[in-house]
């Protein structure tokens, strides 16, 4: 077993060696290095063939038509293209958008920008379980609503929204529905032939592919129209200009092919590891699971260790790569906005750690990690006067603290 142990698979995944091999074949003079847009010679034709094969592989994972897959630089760009693209194209029909308070920042910062441009955005509060229900969406719909953006799997707490049910509702009301699915590919089955989802964002690097490449699913029937956010050359049917990065696209295709073939077995294995880890750390007192216990992906365990500072705990777990909050916001010392939206108090939100397991996690690593967590929490609580008071039966919620 090698240290440190990587348990932050929701931040990024290592590239699968099979993916890396395919990517290396598209870089050098001996490989498939051509520009897919070069129509006048065999180098371009071969590159285009590789790109279209990858487009098919991405489409197959989610049961879509390959023509509905648009290459982007990642899920952040896909979210921007979907939300701004729909908002700008449909601004004459209405200027109201619905999303949730626990979306990824790529969605929330995009809707904030649209608010500055004169759009109105409703931010739905999740339940304590971290779920956004169709009823919540229905209550917020208005005559001038043009778009709903509610994610599939939450990046911090791993909860899984019922996007099929939300899609039924939005389609019946003639409102477009965008889903950020960066965290769900390879973890949850997605069938876009059956689901009434209009736009869906994907990322390669959350699914053992390379960073810097993603895709946006844009439904053809009924047809979804977008305003491009990137201009120059008219690539990707005018929706996203820029020379296609063959090696990254081929990597994403191969990663999604592997995900499709191995998803069921991998999820079963990871569910076992996650359960094993949770059972061991649950021998500690005052450990809380954040988010629904049932509607969640097995890969994610977001736990709060009461009376322990999350940042101190991370410092104590030097041999474990884990995070507090998502990688995109964990540099800020504010408690997680996702946990606060769930109604967690600041103390519990501050004491949360996200453990995320993946393809290369082993039982030995999980046992070692659980042991280290139990030791670290025990030591930190020994130093905590609040823990002593709790053990003495003091109700800390009733104490009025004096400001100095």
Swiss-Prot record:
Top enzyme class: transferase
User: E.C. number, please?
Assistant: 2.8.1.7
One GO term describing the cellular component: L-cysteine desulfurase complex
Q: Which domain of life is it from?
A: Bacteria
Name any one GO molecular function: metal ion binding
- Keyword vocabulary terms for this entry: 2Fe-2S, Cytoplasm, Iron, Iron-sulfur, Metal-binding, Pyridoxal phosphate, Transferase, tRNA processing
Kindly list the positions annotated as binding [2Fe-2S] cluster: 328
Q: Which PANTHER family does the protein's record reference? A: CYSTEINE DESULFURASE (PTHR11601:SF34), CYSTEINE DESULFURYLASE FAMILY MEMBER (PTHR11601)
Q: How does it assemble?
A: Homodimer. Forms a heterotetramer with IscU, probably interacts with other sulfur acceptors.
Q: In its UniProt entry, what is this protein called?
A: Cysteine desulfurase IscS
Q: Which organism is it from?
A: Azotobacter vinelandii
Taxonomy-wise, where does this protein's organism fall, top ranks first?
Bacteria, Pseudomonadati, Pseudomonadota, Gammaproteobacteria, Pseudomonadales
Gene coding for it:
iscS
């Amino acid at each position: 077993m090698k240290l440190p142990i990587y348990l932050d698979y929701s931040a990024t995944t290592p590239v699968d060696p099979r993916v890396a091999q395919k990517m290396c074949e598209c870089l050098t003079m001996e490989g498939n290095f051509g520009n897919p847009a070069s129509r006048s010679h065999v180098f371009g034709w071969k590159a285009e063939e590789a790109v279209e094969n990858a487009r098919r592989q991405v489409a197959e994972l989610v049961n879509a038509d390959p023509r509905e897959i648009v290459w982007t630089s990642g899920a952040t760009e896909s979210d921007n293209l979907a939300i701004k693209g729909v908002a700008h194209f449909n601004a004459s029909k209405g200027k109201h958008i619905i999303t949730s308070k626990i979306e990824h920042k790529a969605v929330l910062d995009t809707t904030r920008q649209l608010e500055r441009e004169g759009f109105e955005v409703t931010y739905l509060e999740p339940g304590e379980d971290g779920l956004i229900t169709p009823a919540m969406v229905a209550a917020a719909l208005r005559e001038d609503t043009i778009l709903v953006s509610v994610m599939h799997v939450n990046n911090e707490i791993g909860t899984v929204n019922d996007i099929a049910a939300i899609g039924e509702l939005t389609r019946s009301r003639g409102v477009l529905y965008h889903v950020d699915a960066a965290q769900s590919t390879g973890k949850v089955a997605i069938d876009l032939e059956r689901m009434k989802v209009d736009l869906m964002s994907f990322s390669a690097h959350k699914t053992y592919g390379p960073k810097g490449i993603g895709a946006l699913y844009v439904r053809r029937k009924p047809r979804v129209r977008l305003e491009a956010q990137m201009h120059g050359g008219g690539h990707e049917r005018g929706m996203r200009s820029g020379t296609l990065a063959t090696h990254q696209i081929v990597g994403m295709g191969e990663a999604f092919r592997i995900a499709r073939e191995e998803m069921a077995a991998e999820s079963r294995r990871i569910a076992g590891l996650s359960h094993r880890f949770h059972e061991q750390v649950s021998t500690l007192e005052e450990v809380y699971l954040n988010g629904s216990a049932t509607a969640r992906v097995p890969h994610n365990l977001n736990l709060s260790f009461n009376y322990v500072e999350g940042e101190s705990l991370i410092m104590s777990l030097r041999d474990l790569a884990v995070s507090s909050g998502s990688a995109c916001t964990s540099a800020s010392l504010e408690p997680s906005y996702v946990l606060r939206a769930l109604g967690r108090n600041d103390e519990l939100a501050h004491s949360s750690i996200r453990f995320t397991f993946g393809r290369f996690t082993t039982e030995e690593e999980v046992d070692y990690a659980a042991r280290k967590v139990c030791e670290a929490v025990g030591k930190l609580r020994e130093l905590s006067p609040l823990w002593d008071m709790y053990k003495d039966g003091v109700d800390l919620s009733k104490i009025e603290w004096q400001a100095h």
